[in-house]
Amino acid sequence: MNPKSPLFLRLSDRLDVYLRLMRADKPIGTLLLLWPTYWALWLASDGIPDLAVLAAFTIGTFLMRSAGCVINDFADRDFDGAVERTKNRPFAQGRVKKKEALLLTAFLCLLAALCLIPLNHLTWLMSLPALFLALTYPFTKRFFPIPQLYLGLAFSFGIPMAFAAVAGNVPPQAWILFAANVLWTLAYDTVYAMADKEDDLKIGIKTSAVTFGRYDIAAVMLCHGGFTLLMAVLGAVIGAAWAYWTAIPIVLLLQYRQYAAIKSRVRQICFETFLANNRIGWVWFTAIFAHTFFAK
C-alpha cells in the first residue's frame, strides 16, 4: 500500500487515535494491574504458574486495562479538555467519535474474553463482576466521593481470579491480598488525583483527593500503612520464608520517600510519585518469588 495514499493515511490516523485511547504508550496502568495478579499467581501455584494461565492473565490484563482506558475517555469526554493533563486526549481534540470508542471497548472486551478459554468455569464466573467494575468505574466520578476506592476493587479482581484459575477455589489469603491491594490502589490513585486536584475542583469531578481535602496526604499514608500491614498479615498466614520479609523495610523506605515528595503537592511531582509505585509492586513480586523459591 502506498504510504502517501488517502486510505493509508486514514488508517494510520485511526490506528494512532485508537492506540492513544488505549494508552498503549503508557504502560504504568498495565503494570500496576499485573503486579498484584502476578503476586496471586505465584502464591497460588507455589512459584510455578502454568504458562498458558500466565499468558492468559498477562494478555487479558493488558486488554482489559486498554478497554478501561477507552471507556474512561468516553465517560470523561466533556471534561478532559478542561484538565491540563488530559487536554490532548483524542476526545478533547475532537479526533474520535463516541461510536468508535464504544466499538473499540467492545472489541477489546471480546478479545479479553477469549483469554478465558483455557481457564476454568470459576474464573469465567469471577470475570463478570470484574468486567462490571472495570466498565462502570469511570462513571462513579460523578456521584461517588471516593471513586478511587471503587477503582481499587476493579484493580484487585485479578487476585481472586488468579487463585480460582490455579487452585479452583479462593482461599482466605486471596482475600487478604485483595484487601491489601485495594488500599494500595487507593493510596497511589489518590496521589494521581492530587495532580489534577485544582482542575477537578473547577469542573466538579469527585475524587479522593478532593474529598480528603487538606488531609489527602494523611489519607495516602494511612492507606500505604494499611497495605503494608496486610502484606505482613499475609506473610504470617502463609508462613512466609525469610526472603518475603525483606520487602517490608524496603517498601517502608519507598513509602516514606513518597511522603517526602508529595508534601509539596506540586502537580508534576505528584504524577512522578504515582509512577514510582511500580517499584513497590516489583519489590513485592520479588519477595513473593523468593518466598516460593526458598519455601520449597
From Swiss-Prot:
EC code(s) of this entry? 2.5.1.39
Is Membrane included in the keywords of this UniProt record?
yes
Q: Where in the cell is it found?
A: Cell inner membrane
Its annotated function is as follows: Catalyzes the prenylation of para-hydroxybenzoate (PHB) with an all-trans polyprenyl group. Mediates the second step in the final reaction sequence of ubiquinone-8 (UQ-8) biosynthesis, which is the condensation of the polyisoprenoid side chain with PHB, generating the first membrane-bound Q intermediate 3-octaprenyl-4-hydroxybenzoate.
Give the family this protein belongs to, as stated in its UniProt record.
Answer: Belongs to the UbiA prenyltransferase family.
Q: Which reaction does it catalyse?
A: all-trans-octaprenyl diphosphate + 4-hydroxybenzoate = 4-hydroxy-3-(all-trans-octaprenyl)benzoate + diphosphate
Q: Where does the UniProt entry say this protein principally localizes?
A: membrane
Q: Which InterPro entries match?
A: HB_polyprenyltransferase-like, Prenyltransferase, UbiA_prenyltransferase, UbiA_prenylTrfase_CS, UbiA_sf
What does this protein need as cofactor? Mg(2+)
Q: What is this protein called?
A: 4-hydroxybenzoate octaprenyltransferase
Give the originating organism: Neisseria meningitidis serogroup B (strain ATCC BAA-335 / MC58)
Pathways per UniProt: Cofactor biosynthesis; ubiquinone biosynthesis
The SS bond pairs are none
* PANTHER family linked: 4-HYDROXYBENZOATE POLYPRENYLTRANSFERASE, MITOCHONDRIAL, PRENYLTRANSFERASES
Please name one Pfam family that this protein belongs to.
UbiA
Q: Which UniProt keywords apply?
A: Cell inner membrane, Cell membrane, Magnesium, Membrane, Transferase, Transmembrane, Transmembrane helix, Ubiquinone biosynthesis
**Top enzyme class of this protein?**
transferase
Q: Which NCBIfam families match?
A: ubiA_proteo (TIGR01474)
What is its membrane topology?
A: Multi-pass membrane protein
Keyword flag Transmembrane: yes
